Amino acid sequence: MDAPLTDAERTALQTSLEALNRQVEATRNILRSNSQKALLQTLHTDQELPDPALEALAGKTINLLHETQQLLEPGHLVLADHFLGYVSTKCLCAAVELKLVDILADADEAGMTVDELADASGAHPDRLQQVLRVLRNDNIFDYDAVSHRYRNNRVSALLHSEHWTQWHNWVDLYGNEFYDIARGIPRSIRREEARWAAQINFDTNDDMFTYFQAQGWLPRLHRTLGGGAIAQAPGIVADYPWHEIGSRTVLDVGGGGGGFLASLLREYPQMRGGILDLPRTIEHACTLFHEPQGPYFDLRERVPRENLIAGDFLKAVPAFEIYTMKWVLHDWKDPDVLTILRCIRASLIPGPDSRLVILESNLSDGQMGRLSRYGDINMMMTANGQERSEEQWRALAAASGWEVSRIYPMRRAWVCAIDLRPSASESGDRKHS
């Protein structure tokens, strides 16, 4: 047992905490003031990207505050947030299912009382009050303690059924089906267990996509992931120097239906594109780009049919100067990732701008890195996959003839752009072979 604090140590700790409280309170009051609201809104507007310097500074502040919280918070509360964490998830599910955000959006500026919300949504007033108390303390919904009225705030507004980001679909799918999948995590990490969490929970040997299709859930999955891609596209398009590619053709390896490629080509009208994917997926992509009713029909001349290529990127990749891969490699373990990277490296057309841009999470610690850790566990439990850290990406690149030129953070996106260029040693070896 540690020795008790001396009077001097206790006084020093008390003085430090009092000074910290004064500083945090003063900073909070400044951020709440009318003079700072416009500045703060630049970080939180959902219609444009935040200022990159301010976002980075705010992220550093959040990490520091969280580290400070970890030093001060009682251990039993930390544990409670984990074994009672289901409460927050399911309260948010309830709010989405009842369409509380839509109801409040149609109300006047004064907002609505719990009784009014309950009448409009068909809820028990007392139970709704309990759910809203949890959510408002997590900064979801605004609450006036004097009038006892609720309004939407910048967080809850993201869940409106017509919001362009469609985050409400994530609450529905991940708060229910994926929530159930997580039950399989404890058993899945045992050494004797071969199946991953999704297979254990649903008692199947099918992969997630096959099982979801059999259950009729696949449209919800595509709708959710598609909405997430749209929500993250502005940062992905803005925060990497895509202009360097000019009028060259980008081959999106594992590019699916072409949503990412389309967003890139619409922003850079000189660029051309192509997709390499499985035959069934390419058939679907052809309809999207080359049928008059397809959403990417306007890009048909820049994505000709011959650039929609059916194949297997574990075996061979067509020769191009520029490749991209978005949310593909986290499905695979390291041996397969090395095979894929080597296939692309072997086919790369040499040039001063030749590259492979990988759009994946950069697994990291700290409060602002938590989405990468959530993603890592989701990949583990649904696909036996993983997210990777910068160190892991650099090691994989070095072992497959590449080097990491730079990693670009991307605003409002869960991915970074990991810019791979052919390694100097590999290029030299090829010249002398």
From Swiss-Prot:
Pathway: Mycotoxin biosynthesis
Residue ranges the record marks as coiled coil: 5-37
GO molecular function: O-methyltransferase activity; protein dimerization activity
Domain of life: Eukaryota
GO biological processes: methylation; secondary metabolite biosynthetic process
Binding site for S-adenosyl-L-methionine: 277, 311-313
EC class: transferase
EC numbers for this chain: 2.1.1.-
Keywords: Coiled coil, Methyltransferase, S-adenosyl-L-methionine, Transferase
Annotated active site: 330
Similarity remark: Belongs to the class I-like SAM-binding methyltransferase superfamily. Cation-independent O-methyltransferase family. COMT subfamily.
PANTHER family: O-METHYLTRANSFERASE CICE (PTHR43712:SF2), PUTATIVE (AFU_ORTHOLOGUE AFUA_4G14580)-RELATED (PTHR43712)
Purpose of the protein: O-methyltransferase; part of the gene cluster that mediates the biosynthesis of aspirochlorine (or antibiotic A30641), an unusual halogenated spiro compound with distinctive antifungal properties due to selective inhibition of protein biosynthesis, and which is also active against bacteria, viruses, and murine tumor cells. The non-ribosomal peptide synthetase (NRPS) aclP is responsible the formation of the diketopiperazine (DKP) core from the condensation of 2 phenylalanine residues.
Protein name: O-methyltransferase aclM
Species for this entry: Aspergillus oryzae (strain ATCC 42149 / RIB 40) (Yellow koji mold)
Species classification: Eukaryota, Fungi, Dikarya, Ascomycota, Pezizomycotina
